[in-house]
Design a protein with these regions (language model features):
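Conserved redox-active cysteine motifs that mediate thiol-disulfide chemistry
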Residues: 73, 81-98
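A short beta-strand-turn-helix
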Residues: 56-77, 101
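N-terminal targeting signals for export/organelle localization
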Residues: 1-53
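Active-site acidic short loop of glycosyltransferases
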Residues: 73-75, 105, 134-135, 152
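Thiol/disulfide oxidoreductase modules built on the thioredoxin-like
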Residues: 127-135, 140-187
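Hydrophobic beta-strand anchors of alpha/beta hydrolase catalytic cores
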Residues: 78-79, 110
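Structural microenvironment flanking redox-active thiols in thiol-disulfide oxidoreductases
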Residues: 91-132, 142-149
């Protein structure tokens, strides 16, 4: 009887140690995972520098629909700041239209933010787009808030964002179709 009691005690001790060890291991993995998530969250910086998450905005399409940048999360983005009176902007727009058409359905979006505050009127911009048969999405920055947030000093200025909204490239001046493809392919 004593032998059986000793065996049971040993078995209970082994079970207790195993449970305690298993609990400790699981807790350490969960804690480590939480610390990694917290660390990743703390390292996110919103801004306009390379490696930052691009600042969100709320602007209107040419049809008056409100759009946030975050509406495009999960897609690579060519974010372009321009105006209809800007000569270099006019030079890059045919390439941007071709890029937009070629990338449709491939998880890549073109978003052209018009510096509407510097234009004659939104109707003038609509007319410019229609006359040139541009079909890529255009957003009106009527108050100039997006241009200010993104610290746009000259136009055209373009940002290349990955699917998480992180800025990988900033290009000041007109871009060619080849530039656009090269930037996107490097993501």
């Amino acid at each position: 009887m004593v032998k059986g009691g000793i065996i049971i005690k040993k078995w209970l001790i082994i079970c207790f140690i195993s449970i305690a060890l298993g609990y400790t291991i699981i807790q350490n993995f969960l804690l480590k995972d939480k610390e990694e998530q917290k660390s990743q969250t703390e390292n996110i910086t919103i801004g306009t520098e390379l490696g930052n998450v691009a600042p969100n905005f709320l602007l209107q399409t040419v049809d008056g629909k409100e759009v946030h940048l975050t509406d495009y999360k999960g897609k690579k983005i060519l974010l372009n700041f321009w105006a209809s009176w800007c000569g270099p902007c006019k030079i890059e727009m045919p390439d941007m239209e071709k890029f937009y058409i070629d990338m449709k359905g491939k998880g890549i979006e073109v978003i052209a933010i018009n510096a509407t505050a510097s234009e004659k009127s939104p109707d003038h911009v609509k007319q410019f787009l229609q006359e040139n048969k541009y079909t890529f999405p255009v957003l009106f920055d009527i108050q100039g808030q997006a241009n200010a947030t993104y610290q746009i000093m000259s136009i055209p200025t373009s940002f290349i964002l990955d699917e998480k909204g992180i800025i990988h490239f900033k290009h000041v001046g007109p871009m060619t179709y080849e530039n656009m493809v090269k930037y996107m392919d490097s993501l």
